[in-house]
From Swiss-Prot:
Protein family (similarity comment): Belongs to the cyclin family.
Protein name: CDK5 and ABL1 enzyme substrate 1
Domain of life assignment: Eukaryota
Cell compartment(s), UniProt: Nucleus; Cytoplasm
Expression induction: Up-regulated by progesterone and down-regulated by estrogen in benign endometrium.
Transmembrane segments: none
Chain intervals for the UniProt region annotation (Interaction with CDK3): 179-492
Organism annotation: Homo sapiens
Pfam families associated with the record: Cyclin_N (PF00134)
Length: 633
């Protein structure tokens, strides 16, 4: 009789797998090994106790992330109505258990109420699951007050593992504690035709669990609407959030005038329809998927976006390689910058190693660099030095020609600091000076670069007592001695004669000798009397100033700026000044020389370049000035 009824209705009940269907069907004839609550026929008003839930053993990291991001939408966009979405692992079926009631409590328990409206075909003909379902007994639908199914309505299920999402009517009835009613025929149009793949079982379920998140299912809407009877309470306690997108298609998702009860709380009608809950769950899952994709995109592109935000341009494709070296001899350090750090990764210094150049090449570079005029510096901002290139307006200027050739990994080469080498270098410079006078043009002499670059500095040249004599002196030579007789001359005539003689001997110097000596007296008075600097510091300032004068860098416009910058540089190099002492010195220079503070500070670097960065002076250049300062004080 059970087989005939099943054949007449062409329906069977479904569970998570074929083994679950067999266990649920045989539960009508044989009691399960575990104690189950018996149907309460005598007292239908009192519901039986709810069987213990089987603990779920399939939580995944992705499901935890989806649950955490349930109500979070990072993109801020409303989900499209026809977008695909999946329930993840929530769409999985319940594992086959020992009892029929526990096996029938699947995660899609919402379909327990839908079984009252029609039977659902369990498997395709010829499969073992269909045979077990047909031989175990008829499908017994529950009486309900559902409206009739739509004529011709059917469900098409494609994809593996779809039947695991449906609940068995046998298990649902046993779980709800209701009396089984005689079977009634159901139309063929109200039954769903399921297409299952082979391989059901323990090995196939794990593969199906990964694929059931995105399954397209179309089922009549009336099959999923509960009647709201009290008897279907425990069997219908499912979660709408577990539905995938195919449970209620768009064709049946139009709002209707019927009032459906909520499956979360059966018995309360009309507050929230099942359609609204299903749509809300669908939008929530779409938001979860988009949130996960947005998070992955943010994590992948965070460094690029941060770089664009900080620099305002895309991140460069190729970065400069950084090498940590311990032995500098093993690495090519040319055209690179070396950062010296300690063993604890503390910054110490940064430097570059430049290739060695011959002295002849250095001289050529000096001549070429001396002929270039500094047109980038305006007269309003700063009065520049002639022949000094500062690299303004974005230009790059190299000062490698001012560096002394040294061995970077060994001892320093001999320089002109010693007495013997100084005499040799002086003879070489005199020969170069004579060559320069013979081959140089008048245009190059006007700049003063040739004479100034090749002429060695003599600290006694500008302070020679023979300069004031001029043509007014008379030299008397005797066998044992020589004497000079100077007639009385007006001071103005003597000064004029001295300047003319100095101009004839040094035509590239634009200042007169009397003006140079006057500036030196002002520098000494300001440094010693007003600021309290010592004689060695003043002697260094004299050397700086005379070098600039002999190179032809001084003129009428920048003479006081050069004098003030020389005193400031000498005070910084030769004295250990505090911050307030440097400020006091700048105030005095501004007051005595009537300078602008901003121009004075900005003029330090041009003077430094004109001095070829040679601020540490040898002893033979400073001592003559120091002796004269000590004698006159």
């Amino acid at each position: 009789m059970a087989a005939a009824a099943a054949a007449a209705t062409t329906a069977a009940c479904s569970s998570g797998s074929a083994g679950t269907d067999a266990a649920g069907a045989s539960g009508l004839q044989q009691p399960p090994p575990q104690p189950q609550p018996q149907p309460a026929a005598a007292a239908p008003a009192q519901p039986p106790p709810e069987p213990p839930r089987k603990p779920r053993m399939d939580p995944r990291r992705r499901q935890a992330a989806l649950s955490f991001l349930t109500n979070i939408s990072l993109d801020g966009r409303l989900p499209p109505q026809d977008a695909e979405w999946g329930g993840g692992e929530e769409g999985g079926a319940a594992k086959p258990g020992a009892g029929g009631a526990c096996g029938a409590r699947t995660r899609f328990s919402l379909l327990a109420a839908a079984e009252r409206g029609g039977c659902i075909a369990l498997a395709a003909p010829g499969t073992p699951a269909a045979g077990l379902a047909a031989g175990s007994g008829p499908c017994l639908p529950q009486p309900s007050s559902l409206p009739p199914l739509i004529p011709g309505g059917h469900a098409t299920v494609s994809g593996p593992g779809v039947a695991r999402g449906f609940a068995s009517p046998l298990g649902a009835g046993r779980a709800s504690g209701e009396q089984w009613q005689p079977p009634r025929p159901a139309p063929l149009a109200a039954c769903a035709q399921l297409q299952l793949l082979d391989g059901s079982g323990a090995a196939g379920q794990e593969e199906l669990e990964e694929d059931d998140a995105f399954i397209s299912v179309q089922v009549p809407a009336a099959a999923f609407l509960g009647s709201g009877t009290p008897g279907s309470g425990s069997g219908s306690r499912g979660r709408l959030n577990s539905f995938t997108q195919g449970i209620l298609p768009i064709a049946f998702s139009r709002p209707t005038s019927q009032n459906y009860c909520s499956l979360e709380q059966p018995g309360q009608g009309g507050s929230t329809s099942a359609f609204e809950q299903l749509q809300r769950s669908r939008r929530r899952l779409i938001s979860q998927r988009s949130s996960l994709e947005t998070l992955e995109d943010i994590e992948e592109n965070a460094p690029l976006r941060r770089c664009r935000t900080l620099s305002g341009s895309p991140r460069p494709k190729n970065f400069k390689k950084i090498h940590f070296i311990k032995n500098m001899r093993q690495h090519d350090t040319r055209n690179g910058r070396i950062v010296l750090i300690s063993g604890r990764r503390s910054f110490c210094s940064i430097f570059s190693v430049l290739p060695y150049r011959d002295s002849t090449q250095v001289g050529d570079l000096k001549l070429d660099g001396g002929r270039q005029s500094t047109g980038a510096v305006s007269l309003k901002e700063i009065i520049g030095l002639e022949g000094v290139e500062l690299g303004a307006d974005g230009k790059t200027v190299s000062y490698t020609q001012f560096l002394l050739p040294t061995n970077a990994f060994g001892a320093r080469r001999n320089t002109i600091d010693s007495t013997s080498s100084f005499s040799q270098f002086r003879n070489l410079s005199h020969r170069s000076l004579s060559i320069g006078r013979a081959s140089g043009t008048q245009g190059s002499l006007d700049t003063g670069s040739d004479l100034g670059d090749f002429m060695d500095y003599d600290p006694n040249l500008l302070d020679d007592p023979q300069w004031p004599c001029g043509k007014h002196k008379r030299v008397l030579i005797f066998p044992s001695y020589m004497t000079t007789v100077i007639d009385y001359v007006k001071p103005s005539d003597l000064k004029k004669d001295m300047n003319e003689t100095f101009k004839e001997k040094f035509p590239h110097i634009k200042l007169t000798l009397s003006k140079i000596r006057s500036l030196k007296r002002e520098m000494r008075k300001l440094a010693q009397e007003d600021c309290g600097l010592e004689e060695p510091t003043v002697a260094m300032a004299f050397v700086y100033f005379e070098k600039l004068a002999l190179k032809g860098k001084l003129n009428k416009q920048n003479r006081k700026l050069c004098a003030g910058a020389c005193v400031l540089l000498a005070a910084k190099i030769g004295s250990d000044l505090k911050k307030h002492e440097v400020k006091h010195l700048i105030d005095k220079l501004e007051e005595k020389f009537r300078l602008n503070r901003r121009e004075l500070i900005a003029f330090e670097f041009p003077v430094l370049v004109a001095l070829e960065f040679a601020l540490h002076l040898p002893e033979h250049e400073v001592m003559p000035h120091y002796r004269r300062l000590v004698q006159s004080s």
